[in-house]
Amino acid sequence: MFDWQQKQLQHITKAGANLPHALLLNGASGIGKHAFALGLSKALLCNKPTAQFLACGTCPSCTWFAESAHPDFRLIEPEDADSADDAPKKKTTKKRQISIAKIRQLVDYLSLSSHQVNARRVILISPAEVLNNASANALLKILEEPPENTLFLLVTSQMQRLIPTIISRCQKIDMPKPTRADALAWLQTQQVSNAENVLDYARGAPLLALQIAEEGDVIITMTKQLALGAKLDPFASAPIFLGVGMERAIDTLQKWIFDLITFQHAQVLCFNTAYGNAFQALSKSVNLNLLLTFQDKLINAKKTADHPLSNEVQLENILLQYTQLFKPI
C-alpha cells in the first residue's frame, strides 16, 4: 500500500466485521489500486494484523500469501496478466480478457469450505473491466447470492466497461491519485531521473510514470516517429508502437494529438514538451477538423484495444489515418 491510500484504508477498516460482500476499487491506471487490493487482502487474512490494519508479515497466513499459496485467497486475472493495472502490459496480440473458465473454476473453489474454520476468504478480480460477457454474467450470479465470509475485491480503471448490475452489487471506493508532491517523493525513492517530466507525461500517476521511465527509449522512438507527420511509415512504425502494448500505444497517440490541438489553439504543450519545434512545423500543415475527428477515433480504439483482430493491422490503419491529417483535403 502507499501513503496516499491511507484514507481509503481507514474507511474500509472502520467497517470491521460489517464489510460488504464486494468492494469495487475504481481509479486511474497506474496509481497503485492493485497493490492496495493485495495489501488489503493480506491484512484481512492475517492472523495478527497491526493496529494500523497492516499484515504482520510473519504469521502462517502471511507466509502463505508471500508464497502465492494462501488457500483462502484467489486472484482472478487475465491469462497474460502481470500484476494488473500497475505493471507493464505484456507484448501480445492475443485477446486480453478474463475467461468464463476462470469464473467456473472460482465457482468450484467457492463450493469448498475455507481452509481455516470460519475464516474469511478473499477473491481479487483485477482488472475487472476485462471480464467478457460470459464471465461477467457468471460473476454476477455469484454476487447475487454471495457465499458467507467471502469478500470480493474488484479493481478497475475503466468502470464504464463493467455491466451496471455488477457495479450495483458492489460498494464503490474511489481510489485517488497522490498529490504531486507525494508522487514526486515516491518516484525519488525509485531513483527516477527527470521525475517531473515523466510524471506529467503519466498524468500524475506515479506507477505509470515509473513504467514510462523504464521504457524511456521506446517512448522516445515512438514520439520521434510521430514528429514525422505525413512522412511517418505506418507499416514500419506499427511494430515499434506495439512494443509497449496496444493500450499504451493508443495512449501515446492520444497525448500527441492532445498536444497538437492545444498547440493549435494556445501554443501550449502538456505532455510532449521536448518537441516544440516539431509541433510548430506540424501545426502549419495539420487539418484541425480532421484532428478532432481522429481524436474521437482514438477514444473508440482504446475501448476496443482487447479486440481479437490483429493489433498490428489495427495500429497500421490508425497510423495511416494519422499521416493523412497532414495532407491537403
Residue spans for each PLM region:
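Charged, glycine-rich active-site and insertion segments that engage polyanionic ligands
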Residues: 1-43, 51, 60, 148-151, ...
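Residues immediately C-terminal
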Residues: 130-131, 145, 161
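Conserved adenine-binding aromatic site and its adjacent loop/helix in ATP-hydrolyzing domains
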Residues: 108, 141, 164, 168
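Clamp-loader machinery-focused feature within the broader ASCE/P-loop NTPase space
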Residues: 1-134
